[in-house]
From Swiss-Prot:
The modification Phosphothreonine is found at residue 142. It comes from Meriones unguiculatus (Mongolian jird). There is a cross-link at residue 115 (Glycyl lysine isopeptide (Lys-Gly) (interchain with G-Cter in SUMO1)). This is Hypoxanthine-guanine phosphoribosyltransferase. There is a cross-link at residue 115 (Glycyl lysine isopeptide (Lys-Gly) (interchain with G-Cter in SUMO2)).
Length: 218
């Protein structure tokens, strides 16, 4: 039986990094507490996850399913590393891509009401090996709902890669197959993670400030 890959665990008392140490867009300078995961660390970790995916799923055609919008940066970078491995190693796998868009957040809370509001026809997943790529697992309810939806199309295999998993008492206990970082129960933005559609244009994963939440509240 396949085992889930390990992750980098960021402790509850992790201080993060001062904003002044990084290039932060000026329009967000007053809206963030700190840089939590620098972009370079994200990229290095993503490269390793690509190797883990190849080891676990290599040899079979993969349909990579991107969960929009927050997952698009991680999705693009992960697939770039997989493509590099395809070019430079003896083991390669053909890949195709699909997209699905879900909505479960209002302000900084996961509503638990999961809506599929866009995406391709998922009948293309039938009989395929599917890699779902997500930005963050919070309560886990969204992913459980998506997995139930995907299973209706009878894929051959389903694996989930998430850049982040949040430690939270609200969790239903779901854990993805591939995890970049396990983080404390803080609301993070950047690297395509948003707060009411803002902050997707940050390179780093950052902790939003209370003033930032108030400024961009829906």
């Amino acid at each position: 039986m396949a085992t889930r890959s390990p992750s980098i665990v960021i402790g509850d008392d992790e201080p993060g990094y001062d904003l002044d140490l990084f290039c932060i867009p000026k329009h967000y300078a007053e809206d963030l507490e700190k840089v939590f995961i620098p972009h370079g660390l994200i990229m290095d970790r993503t490269e390793r996850l690509a190797r883990d995916v190849m080891k676990e799923m290599g040899g079979h055609h993969i349909v990579a399913l991107c969960v929009l919008k927050g997952g698009y940066k991680f999705f693009a970078d992960l697939l770039d590393y997989i493509k590099s491995l395809n070019r430079n190693t003896d083991r390669s796998i053909p890949m195709t891509v699909d997209f699905i868009r879900l909505k479960s957040y209002c302000n900084d809370q996961s509503t638990g009401d999961i809506k599929v509001i866009g995406g391709d026809d998922l009948s293309a997943l039938t009989g395929k090996n599917v890699l779902i790529v997500e930005d963050i697992i919070d309560t886990g309810k969204t992913m459980q709902t998506l997995l139930s939806l995907v299973q209706k199309y009878s894929p051959k295999m389903v694996k989930v890669a998430s850049l982040l998993v949040k430690r939270t008492p609200r969790s239903v206990g779901y854990r993805p197959d591939f995890v970049g970082f396990e983080i404390p129960d803080k609301f993070v933005v950047g690297y395509a993670l948003d707060y009411n559609e803002y902050f997707r244009d940050l390179n780093h994963v950052c902790v939003i400030s209370e003033s930032g939440k108030a400024k961009y509240k829906a």
